[in-house]
Amino acid sequence: MADKITSRQQDYSQWYIDLVRSAKLADYSDVRGCMVIRPNGYAIWEKMQAALDGMFKETGHVNAYFPMFIPESFIAKEAEHIEGFAPECAVVTHGGGEELAEKLYVRPTSETIIWSSYKKWIQSYRDLPLLINQWANVVRWEMRTRLFLRTTEFLWQEGHTAHADPEEAQEEVIRMINVYRTFAEEYMAMPVIVGKKSESEKFAGADATYCIEAMMQDGKALQAGTSHNLGQNFAKAFDCQFQTKEGVLDYVWATSWGVSTRLIGALIMAHSDDKGLVLPPKLASRQVVIIPILKGDKEEVRAHARFIAKALNKHGISTFVDDSENNSPGWKFAEYELQGIPVRIELGPRDIAEGKCIVARRDTFEKTEVLLDAEMTENIEEILNNIQQNLYERALQFRQDNTVEATTWEEFKAGVEKGFVIAHWDGTDETEALIKEETKATIRVMPTDEEYRKQYNMDEPGTCIRSGNPATQKVVFAKAY
Amino acid sequence: MADKITSRQQDYSQWYIDLVRSAKLADYSDVRGCMVIRPNGYAIWEKMQAALDGMFKETGHVNAYFPMFIPESFIAKEAEHIEGFAPECAVVTHGGGEELAEKLYVRPTSETIIWSSYKKWIQSYRDLPLLINQWANVVRWEMRTRLFLRTTEFLWQEGHTAHADPEEAQEEVIRMINVYRTFAEEYMAMPVIVGKKSESEKFAGADATYCIEAMMQDGKALQAGTSHNLGQNFAKAFDCQFQTKEGVLDYVWATSWGVSTRLIGALIMAHSDDKGLVLPPKLASRQVVIIPILKGDKEEVRAHARFIAKALNKHGISTFVDDSENNSPGWKFAEYELQGIPVRIELGPRDIAEGKCIVARRDTFEKTEVLLDAEMTENIEEILNNIQQNLYERALQFRQDNTVEATTWEEFKAGVEKGFVIAHWDGTDETEALIKEETKATIRVMPTDEEYRKQYNMDEPGTCIRSGNPATQKVVFAKAY
């Protein structure tokens, strides 16, 4: 049963920790900065993996697996890459009881080890494109960790593609950030802003980084996925050339893109409440719990509960019955609210006599009566669809309510304490750094979505919110996880 | 297209390497002893994972994820365990640019890190059983590596369960080795012998190890899966006690069980031939290739091919069309034989006119005519089922043909050069070690399957094949991968 969860209002950070622990989603391990993803948390990851993997395959990608150890000399081949990643790597110096001739880095990301293979596999334009994804664990040494959001080891997928020309690579970059957007919005019920990162925020080794950014319930931003245009940087670092259709040699064009178990943290922070986890039905491994009220003819109540569960499962709605007598219905209500089961069905002898049951929604706590008739499965399905839709709309409304367009520095400073701020920026690293120093807010994204750009007149020229210099566009600022 | 594959007869080891490379299943990487699992190989692993994961869940298990780093002090807690595993570990000594206070071992297996969590999660019999599985990468430093069969890093699943009494733990051990048997026989079409390992071959830290052993086409044995009864060893090492139903404290009973990407090597060695990979249809991500013979009205032939592919896919048979004009039909035949596509359909204008197509089986190369009628999908399905069945029976026949019951030392020595030898053993470590030293053969398994025991009169007392001392039972000897 739930330990007491601190309320969001009282202490948002503590609420998050309490929730993750109480709902048994994850635990810190005895290894510094590493987490244990417990079965309840891992079940969410499995649903995410299944949906994403299907979308990757539909867009022509195949899975493969590359070594997790990267020789030090490989990491060093791409200058920006080593500068960005080497300081946060775990380093293997001994193996099989002996000191290694060359140190091995545990992959923080796999561009280098993968391009050392691509070099062998790609000779001609006929070998392109190469569209490969990998599901793997990666390690980035973190000083300050937070379950799911920032841990030394985490799970992710990383796509690595190779193309014959820059246009095709750029198409891939955009295709995949849009796949992430679709996943975030349609599965996670989490609205995101699609766009580009500023130079200072882009991936170490990329020409350009695209991202999806979401707003959490405390108004902070969370980067939920990235897609990088790597240009010819890694092909040059690994001397990966191919013969073009025209018969000349050129370096291969590359992309990479990834999302991680961080998405579980985003999911929690986007929707959950003071009673526990709130899961969008599409990512709930268990969508409906039936709690029989065991009075009168208990076996008859149980039989009805099982019958309904069977019908719902047959209809593709993942349902289970908790008919244990160790715990009271009230205890069970609280427990499954904590676990984020989207729909609870209460069923007692009187309900059965009246041919109905009580259906409680996790998102709104609204209770309705549903008839135990031939349309029941469809009615429950509709409720699940409504929950999915409502979570998205609620989160979108929240984001809109907590986004301000700042025209003064005072508005800006107040705005980033509360949510996203849309403001003019002069385009310089210096101003960006200054704003970060003074407010802890960073440029989260330079939106590329037309609708979003129009909504906030992002293309309107103006003066920079901090420097007062001319600015050609507005960008989105926020504090971030 | 295929590089030339060495024939099995000429050089079995080279045949294996050639096949793995030519069919693009895996590649050595630039990291010592580590492999790249290429998309064709990984697709097999994905099919294996899906089938096994389903079977684990049906038997009540859930997935979770534990850190891959294990503090040195944890490994040291179970005496036999550290002795067995420490010498083959990769060791992280630096992280985030600094030397670590305590070295971290990259997991060679996860008993220790998992039991350090179980200790926190288990207080009472109500918390038991705990039935958790993990899909992960592990590292065991190997001096002599072979793609899939023995590499420094490999992928696997490891189940770790906790129970309130030894009977339930033993039931779990047997349940899971039987799950592996079912998987090996029904999906991999690979007959296996189920049984116990001798003391010297059991897992470091286990009271007993059960295994499934398969025969490869060179007569060698391959251990394809293990299930360990860990007794209270790890619970004691991690001081994991629970309150029993009777209200007293006791140590928790444990099991662990695993299979790895080694199964892909087993699959190759069990069925494949000099033309390339032979895949059982249940593990083929692509089961049927349609090769249109592009003569006459090419577009009409193509349209028919696509129509058939659509019908087969709709029926749940994974089918694709190769209608490229860059390569000849003959080239395609060889290429898809190399890749192990179970069924090839050839379809030319004359076939279409006659309302039929040619269906070629990968396992027997047999060609039959199949009518392009309403029963076609079912006929193809039947052929796929026949292939699955035939591969199993062929492998079983091969195993029987290459198993000898030895009653003299000469017979024994000749037998282990060819396959499995069933012989009396006096039950001592000394004799076992002597036999290994003299013949390189080891005790692969002490069968527990009644049918197998009867077939070879394993319970018949006799005299030890090597020492001449009294022996209460026969066991299975072989050279092994």
UniProtKB/Swiss-Prot annotation, chains A, B:
Protein's cellular compartments: Cytoplasm
Entry's family note: Belongs to the class-II aminoacyl-tRNA synthetase family. ProS type 3 subfamily.
Cited function: Catalyzes the attachment of proline to tRNA(Pro) in a two-step reaction: proline is first activated by ATP to form Pro-AMP and then transferred to the acceptor end of tRNA(Pro).
Gene3D superfamilies on file: Anticodon-binding domain (3.40.50.800), Bira Bifunctional Protein, Domain 2 (3.30.930.10), C-terminal domain of ProRS (3.30.110.30)
Species this protein is from: Chlorobaculum parvum (strain DSM 263 / NCIMB 8327)
NCBIfam families in alphabetical order: proS_fam_I
One Pfam family in the UniProt entry: ProRS-C_1
GO biological process terms held by the UniProt record: prolyl-tRNA aminoacylation
HAMAP family in UniProt: Pro_tRNA_synth_type3
Catalytic activity, EC: 6.1.1.15
Chief localisation class: cytoplasm
Reactions performed catalytically: tRNA(Pro) + L-proline + ATP = L-prolyl-tRNA(Pro) + AMP + diphosphate
Keyword Aminoacyl-tRNA synthetase: yes
Record's subunit section: Homodimer.
Protein name from the UniProt record: Proline--tRNA ligase
Domains (record comment): Consists of three domains: the N-terminal catalytic domain, the anticodon-binding domain and the C-terminal extension.
